Amino acid sequence: MGKKAKWFSSVKKAFSPDSKKSKQKLAEGQNGVISNPPVVDNVRQSSSSPPPALAPREVRVAEVIVERNRDLSPPSTADAVNVTATDVPVVPSSSAPGVVRRATPTRFAGKSNEEAAAILIQTIFRGYLARRALRAMRGLVRLKLLMEGSVVKRQAANTLKCMQTLSRVQSQIRARRIRMSEENQARQKQLLQKHAKELAGLKNGDNWNDSIQSKEKVEANLLSKYEATMRRERALAYSYSHQQNWKNNSKSGNPMFMDPSNPTWGWSWLERWMAGRPLESSEKEQSNSNNDNAASVKGSINRNEAAKSLTRNGSTQPNTPSSARGTPRNKNSFFSPPTPSRLNQSSRKSNDDDSKSTISVLSERNRRHSIAGSSVRDDESLAGSPALPSYMVPTKSARARLKPQSPLGGTTQENEGFTDKASAKKRLSYPTSPALPKPRRFSAPPKVESGGVTVTNGAGS
């Protein structure tokens, strides 16, 4: 409404006499000529007089639009005044040659000034509306061209792909969260059930420990049991890994230590240890020196006495007190029979055969007592190292025990009454096998002369 009021006020000012007077004064000041009659009087005279012979000009909207294309703003009052001023031709009067007179507008013939002004205003306003519609149409055309371009299509395709990927990732994350929540719920249910079972067991008193031992002792016992189980498993693994090696050694060894009916007979710890036992030079030297001294005193020991002495050693040795881990050393003490150095060759061969038969009988008895248990314990003792362990080395007490237990010593004679003669006879009743090459050879003792009897390694003279 404010714009319309301005338009009407500008039109009124354009057609008011005050504005015309001011315009005439401005024109007189510029040209130096004063017009006598006013414009209204001329208009009245022209309206009373007949119209001139000039043809009226037609109103063309296109010309107005072209003229106003550069001006995008709505028309102002100054433009309307200028248009009205330019449209009205000025005809000089005949009375005063320098006076400028305004003529009636020939553009709107037969119409009043108000109608002509209204037509002009409508024309200008319609041109403004047409320019605005053209501007909007140009914007739409540009937008359409931009949307139909290849760059826009590529961007739209990339945007759609990104949206699809984003939706897929969101669905996967949602599914994973649901699965994790379900797993957590299932785990919590299991924990609750386990806790409920533990509480029920505590209420019933099933897991109550009635022992008076402290917690540290109970834990120590459990730890010792666990360590014993692990040692047992290591021993079994060691025995299984060395089974083929011992089997090959038993096949290539002396057949006296084999049992054809039982292929695992030679698997006890005693035969394996005797087969792999190295020579102990210091102990052999001591035993040989003791044997030499005893042989110089008793040079007429026959075959039966040697066998009896071996039997006494086998029967009296298990009665001697020893620790749990000293058993292999005790076996070493009475399963390494020294051979008399002053006997002839035939008595030495028979003595070796008797000792072999006695060893085989004793090993058979030990094997009958514990077939699997002894093997496992022996494998456990050998699990530390495949060579001779440190605990198998004879100690001072074992060496001291070896000296009086020699077949020619005094201790064996004192313990002669405690031996089992029946068992000795039973052992000696087994048939002896023919002499075979011994797996171990002892060094020959030096030549000794005593009582007119000369004993050498081969024969006596």
UniProtKB/Swiss-Prot annotation:
Keywords: Calmodulin-binding, Cytoplasm, Cytoskeleton, Nucleus. InterPro entries: DUF4005, IQ_motif_EF-hand-BS. A motif (Nuclear localization signal) lies at residues 425-432. It is found in: Nucleus; Cytoplasm, Cytoskeleton. The keyword Nucleus applies. GO terms for molecular function: calmodulin binding. Pfam families: DUF4005, IQ. Residues 141-158 are annotated as: Calmodulin-binding. PROSITE patterns: IQ. Its main location: nucleus. Residues 310-345 have a biased composition (Polar residues). The keyword Cytoplasm applies. Coiled coil: none annotated. Residues 114-142 form the IQ domain. Residues 1-55, 278-461 are annotated as: Disordered. One of its GO terms (cellular component) is cytoplasm. May be involved in cooperative interactions with calmodulins or calmodulin-like proteins. Recruits calmodulin proteins to microtubules, thus being a potential scaffold in cellular signaling and trafficking. May associate with nucleic acids and regulate gene expression at the transcriptional or post-transcriptional level. Binds to multiple calmodulin (CaM) in the presence of Ca(2+) and CaM-like proteins. Belongs to the IQD family. This is Protein IQ-DOMAIN 2. It comes from Arabidopsis thaliana.
